[in-house]
């Protein structure tokens, strides 16, 4: 197997990452993995390319290592590569990635256990690497590898809690002795191991009886039993665990924790957060240690500007509450959060985080125990007076501030709250002004979300709600294309305010405005939006639909709507009719609705609309109102109705949209099998009993061929002879290519699926055609033509002609067999071991070959009128001679 160069591996990796399953369908897993591992050992591949290749093992280990045998082989090969690599700074990045790749393969494929020799060797190797404290043996250049090894061990300890619990003394000594930049990784590793060991002891309940001291001083082998039962560590689970160490054990553990906390300022903010959280869990389980141990750190953390460190304060407060934080501390934190939400030097996402912290603030004595949004009791109206949203804020900040202030004014009473509600309403009106003056999509969405928030909290303020309704009506009449926004607002507020009348009031007001419109050009232009609103209003049984029916009748009778026969408009009309048919007070509008449907079924110029109107007319005039509602709301999912029944299609329910939706097939039921050699004719094979309306679609991956038209197959039954389809190929350039193939088909239950089939490969050999000559031409004429073409194809600087020679060691008999098997159709002459071959490649190119054997060596002399063909011809000749 020839080694691939760096460029080809870059393309290979990109192709694999885009679609791993499709890629592995074209080549075997074992073959590709073997090639990858082999080239990782090659000196011809750049180091950066090798890192890219190992990313496949990091991202897709389950695809490349499907069984335990493959996992062991892969891990062993990577270990051997790692051991053979020199300890140079140049190879350091590659060595670190090798460690990560080995660990990922072993953990992801569940091969990290005591029965795996590679797992044992890898764990021992990691401990050996990190034992070089302060770079005494390998030097500074090896420090990144030590850091990576620490992270690998931390990952193992996180996946298998307690795995390193019998090595705690050695880990602690290394953590204390390490004074380089790697100290951070050693500290985090030891802290995770300590927390898991405490948790393991706390699960036994009761006094530790010296078990904690033994664990802290243990220096034995790895605890492989931890790999047998993986335990998922949940932060909340530690609250139910309790460890009661003795006084001496408490003193030792407290000394260790104090030293870890003293070193915390040496760590990066993110690592500090990780360290604090691990120690918080330890203190929460070891009840004999007071949370006051964190007091010295709070002085530093209270003044921090770093997000991670501030998050550590909130984590401590959520766990320890008033055991660590006083009322003054809590008040200070709330003030700090309010100030940080508007700090000019902070980015918008950070300020939004602080706003969210206000809504989920861990209070010392919370009034409620739910995890939903709640304001702290100490947060007052005066403290939030500077948080008023304005149009200069970004949209997320605007809505978050409105949400916080709405909760503040809702929970407080008095003049401050009344003024605050008025200010918030003015803010909503300022957004309204921007939307009314043709605001963009983002500001429009923000306005409707702001309206929803205002209605959610202040729906009891009748004056503001009436003004809001008037403004919304005015906005709709000036911009009817906002109908989907209005419908969504009505739906969401109705869900939110189940027993409130405002959504119905808004719906009724919109209906009144629409039905009073004249049937002029402006109304007809926005008729589609009006019909969407009326269709939604018709779903409210408390709103009379008489005016809607009269408006629809007037629109149809007094306009050219029917003569135009627009399918979309006709179905929009019938959608309103369908919801009106389900109305409880149908008798009051029976005559008007019947006239409308009868007019549509006779006058509308679209047959589909006519049929649907006829169905609704028949139902209206022949079925009682109770049965009518059940028929139109019938869903096949809830009854025994066939999924393709007419009622399910005509009611526009979920099943109708489901049938119109093309789904992605979970597994491929179709395949194309070639039936004629040399001709692109295939038979369709199916694993399903029956498929219908099959459409085969072909997509070019390049521009070398003309597009292939879709091929339609009416049906396919598993017990019948499969149909044969022929694919017509029209090349623009005579080079190999690949067509992506997909199929769309319907199953017996009426659902349409789309699936990808195996790609269609067009090889270089398949484009060979004999010279287009009359069939009755004598051999002499063909021979003369070959000679003239051979002379004409002599290369020079003025053309693209080229000649080449291909030699391969073989006997005369072998050469004869090769020519007979591969070029018999294209042979012009065969005389005394010499062969003259002429090949035509559409659309307009040729390849001429003069083949002869000398001294058991076959010599292929080649001339062509397109030098770009030579690499493909060379590959083809290599293939046939090797065979």
From Swiss-Prot:
Determine if Transport is one of this entry's keywords.
yes
Where does the UniProt annotation place the signal sequence? none
User: Is Transmembrane among the key words of this record?
Assistant: no
- Give the top-rank taxon of the lineage listed in the UniProt record for this protein: Eukaryota
Listed under GO cellular component are: AP-type membrane coat adaptor complex
Q: Which Pfam families match?
A: AP5B1_barrel, AP5B1_C, AP5B1_middle, AP5B1_N
One BP annotation, GO: endosomal transport
Sorted alphabetically, which keywords does the UniProt record give? Protein transport, Transport
Q: What quaternary arrangement does the UniProt entry report?
A: Probably part of the adaptor protein complex 5 (AP-5).
Instruction: Give the function comment from the record.
Output: As part of AP-5, a probable fifth adaptor protein complex, it may be involved in endosomal transport.
This chain's protein is named AP-5 complex subunit beta-1
Organism for this UniProt entry = Xenopus tropicalis
